[in-house]
């Protein structure tokens, strides 16, 4: 269920400060964050944000289509290795 419009978008304050500093300096370095729950704002477009997936930081280049989504949607936490082949079926 989406967040109420009267509440506004959620973004962690420490991430917002890092993003504003990167925009102000015109810094191309990735902004490292553990905040997967923060929403992508229009001022983040063009920045590279390194989102933690539980093991490493995945670089995410923010585009206009991503605005309104959460950062965690773009850094998968699970790796799918396919289904194991059935040994009986190979005979």
Curated annotation (Swiss-Prot):
Keywords: Ribonucleoprotein, Ribosomal protein, RNA-binding, rRNA-binding. GO terms for molecular function: rRNA binding; structural constituent of ribosome. PROSITE patterns: RIBOSOMAL_S19. Pfam families: Ribosomal_S19. One of its GO terms (cellular component) is cytoplasm. Signal peptide: none annotated. One of its GO terms (biological process) is ribosomal small subunit assembly. It comes from the Bacteria. Belongs to the universal ribosomal protein uS19 family. NCBIfam families: rpsS_bact. Protein S19 forms a complex with S13 that binds strongly to the 16S ribosomal RNA. This is Small ribosomal subunit protein uS19. It comes from Stutzerimonas stutzeri (strain A1501) (Pseudomonas stutzeri).
